[in-house]
Each structure stands twice: as structure tokens, then as C-alpha cells.
Amino acid sequence: MTWDATNIFLLVANILTILYILYNDAVIPLWKGKTVLTVKLRSRGRWDGYIFVGIIALLFISNTFFREGPQLTSILLAVMGILFIYICFFRSSKAVFKETGLFYALLFFPYSKIERMNLSEDGILVIETNRQRLMLFARSEKDLEKMLAVFTKYN
């Protein structure tokens, strides 16, 4: 087993992916106070994930069976494939509402920084802060009503 640049890159990518999963699924629900509401959102760009998992699978198959590449590289590619299968197929994007703000796309946005909110006809809640625009794609009308109720209560 050799630790060449490819294997080091794959190891770092796997560690960062594990940290992302832990932060998103374990830290965010506990951080910044009590969770008031967690809403699963409609997924966007699902095909990007499928393509990425397919590329990782092709690299794994190519390295393992056709090139008979290093075993460590195959193991790291397999681990990366499993991690991204979890991210793409089993995990869904969500908005986590706390008493002081909300987590969306791994970032915390305090309610005090929200300048404007708009609701589109197709169920997209657009939240404008002083720096960026957040687009929350609600899965159902019930989820949208729950989000709006939290905003009216804590804002």
C-alpha cells in the first residue's frame, strides 16, 4: 500500500465527506438551541448526484478490474462511493428552524437578518437576507404552512 497523491486526495475527500455528514445530521440539530421545526425540502439537482456516484463507480470498476490498480485506491474509492450513495439516495435536504434562526445549506441565518420573504405560486419560499437569497422548496403545502407559522412566531 502506497500513499501517493491520489490516495491522499481520496482520504482527505472521504474525511471531509464524513465530517459533512456528521455536521449535517448530528451537530446542526443540537447547535444554537432547541430545534423548533425540521422540514424536509424538495430536492434539486438530483441528477448531479447520480452522475457523481456513477463516475465514482466507473473509477472503482476501472481501477479494480481493468487496470488492476493499487488496492488502497480501490478501497478509498469504494468508501467514497458508499458515502455518496448515502448522500445522494438516502439523505434529503432540510431546513432546521431554531428559536433564533434557521439552518439551511449548512449555514445559520438569524431571523433578525431576514429583510423580506416572498411566496411564489409553486410553493417556493424566498427569504432575502442582506447578503443573499434563500429559496426553500417545500414538499407540501402543510410544510409551507409550518414554516410560515414558525416565522410568524419567532420573528
UniProtKB/Swiss-Prot annotation:
Similarity comment: Belongs to the UPF0266 family.
Stated name of the protein: UPF0266 membrane protein lwe0739
Main location, first listed in the record: membrane
Membrane topology annotation: Multi-pass membrane protein
Species in which this protein is naturally found: Listeria welshimeri serovar 6b (strain ATCC 35897 / DSM 20650 / CCUG 15529 / CIP 8149 / NCTC 11857 / SLCC 5334 / V8)
Key word Glycoprotein present: no
UniProt keywords, alphabetically: Cell membrane, Membrane, Transmembrane, Transmembrane helix
Transmembrane helix in keyword set: yes
Subcellular location, record wording: Cell membrane
Source species, domain of life: Bacteria
Listed GO CC annotations: plasma membrane
InterPro entries: DUF986
TM regions (residue ranges): 8-28, 46-66, 70-90
